[in-house]
């Protein structure tokens, strides 16, 4: 029986081969399968990866697909008791990560999704990894910088816990502790297949960004828990696939889509007002300090 299926999306080999190499030594003794979704790479990176790592399965896409759509292709054929979505711009440095995280999930049967600590390229400092569902108060606190005020995020759990001044949820210290969250990032998204089958696959209407939030929402709605486990860590080189301008616009638009699908209709116009308010604040701020960034926010305002 396959214990672990790993789904990786890639369109270039810059990080992929080092990711696959780092997996080899950590999967010894675990019945596993690696499913690589070649996202319409011009140099057919999947074919090259298959030659170097013959044990992997390759799904070739002829057109560029979104994060959720591509992962769904791998998730549909995954046979493992656990299914891991892993970014190709990651490196596995903990040799026992899979043995021990799977054991932890076996000991915690209510957990449907778990993630580990994500290290920056210095292999010391931690990145943010997920947070709490984007309710109106949380989005307001995020878009107006209110959650940067020390103590505020003790009252309002943040949508994006980030580095900041607050001693509670914001700052690297938060990501050093084991805790339950509403959602975790897709860079390392370990699912119990039983829970995945119940919650469903990614909603392919979300091309990029917020898709993990939406899927996590369905996991929790189905009664499963989501945990962040920084005892185990990987390196995430991050932001390799999408520039900041597209990322920003995708996230704001997909927050609106999330509200259309899951929240009461009266909340959407309030969300849109909050998003536009936050964007205007950034246009003013960066207009004084960094005009090129301000131009990005002007485009974002028009997009929402």
Write out the residue ranges for each language-model feature.
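A conserved acidic beta->alpha catalytic loop
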Residues: 22, 38-47, 63, 91
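Short aromatic/hydrophobic "clamp" motif used to bind/position activated sugar donors
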Residues: 83
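Active-site-adjacent helix/loop segment of glycosyltransferases
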Residues: 119, 216-293
